[in-house]
Amino acid sequence: MNELTHVNSAYLRHHAKNPIHWKFWSDGILELAVQENKLIILSIGYSACHWCHVMEKETFRNELIANFMNQNFICIKIDREEHPEIDHIYMDFILNTKGNGGWPLNCILLPDTKPVFAGTYYKADDWLNLISRFYTIFKENPDKLIAYSKNYIEHLN
């Protein structure tokens, strides 16, 4: 179930009718990701972001994509204006791994919230291909993603 129906954020309310079961960033939902051993899709944006609205319309309203995300990931949506501290963590990741960033900021995280991928806007087919690849890698060889994340964190230290 999408949890964004009764929120103050105009940006999050805009996603309330998405077929994706968007959740809030909370200790409970993060514990659920660990218990279910699921990757997290973290999508961060804000109301005035043009490409956030385009991706919401083209990608996040797509039933096929929503079904795949709902079955295989914990899906979290954040308004960067409400949680700049979370946005900052994952914006640092994309800046350090790709050299540039922006919004929407779409991340794939391990169940313990360590990042393994970050990108910005994706068309529907590209997004589905991307998340399908990460899902398959995590199911078939999770150590590969865990090692990548560990190497990134060690590189920063």
Name each model feature, range by range:
Residues 1-157:
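Replace the tail clause
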